[in-house]
Regions:
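N-terminal loops that bind phosphate or other acidic moieties
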Residues: 73, 94, 112-113
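Hydrophobic/aromatic beta-strand patches that form the interior of the parallel beta-sheet core
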Residues: 50, 80, 123-127
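Acidic, glycine-rich active-site loops and adjacent beta-strand->loop/helix elements
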Residues: 58, 86, 97, 129-132
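Short Gly/Thr/Asp-enriched flexible loops that form oxyanion-binding sites at enzyme active sites
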Residues: 87-100, 137-138
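Glycine-rich phosphate-binding loop
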Residues: 77-89
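ATP/NTP phosphate-donor binding region
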Residues: 1-78
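A glycine/threonine-rich phosphate-anchoring loop and its flanking beta-alpha core
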Residues: 100-148
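Fold-independent oxyanion-binding glycine-rich loops
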Residues: 9-10, 29-30, 82-84, 127-130, ...
Length: 148
């Protein structure tokens, strides 16, 4: 997917224009819920259909699997990721689309066990909140597997 960078003072206020009517899953961390950013975004656009805020630092497959099962039946067309590198990486994991909604398919794609051409990606709008690895512009995600 090509990357387009948009920046500017108060650019978040234009988020509805970028969502463009698509059913959106918002992925963030609990801190942004507590600070009121999620409520602000919901006021800016009516297209947020669900919020995932339990992304931990250094996301692990086992944690993402639990969240995957929570969202697998949500019919979203876009992911809005607001947070640091861990949130952006988790969003890339959830963007791997498969018709059967099977977790193992997604894990195998991420681990490189299946050809990357066999799937499509759900688009992501990333709003990075930290200066870090540049996760918002790369196709890679760091997902930890402490069991292997």
């Amino acid at each position: 997917m090509p990357t387009k960078i948009i920046y500017g003072n108060n650019e978040l206020d234009n988020i509805d224009k970028y969502i463009n009517g698509r059913k959106t899953l918002l992925i963030t961390s609990e801190g942004f819920v507590k600070r009121g950013l999620v409520n602000k975004v919901k006021l800016l656009t009516p297209y947020i259909i669900d919020v995932i805020s339990e992304v931990k630092s250094h996301p692990e497959f086992k944690d993402l699997e639990i969240t995957y099962h929570k969202i697998q039946n949500i019919d979203f067309e876009l992911i809005l990721a607001i947070g640091g590198g861990s949130v952006l990486d988790a969003s890339k994991f959830f963007s791997v689309y498969n018709e059967k909604k099977e977790y193992q398919f997604v894990e195998n794609i991420i681990k490189g066990k299946l050809p990357k051409e066999d799937h499509k990606l759900i688009p992501i709008i990333s709003i990075p909140t930290t200066a870090g690895t540049g996760s918002e512009i790369t196709p890679w995600a760091t997902i930890w597997d402490m069991d292997e």
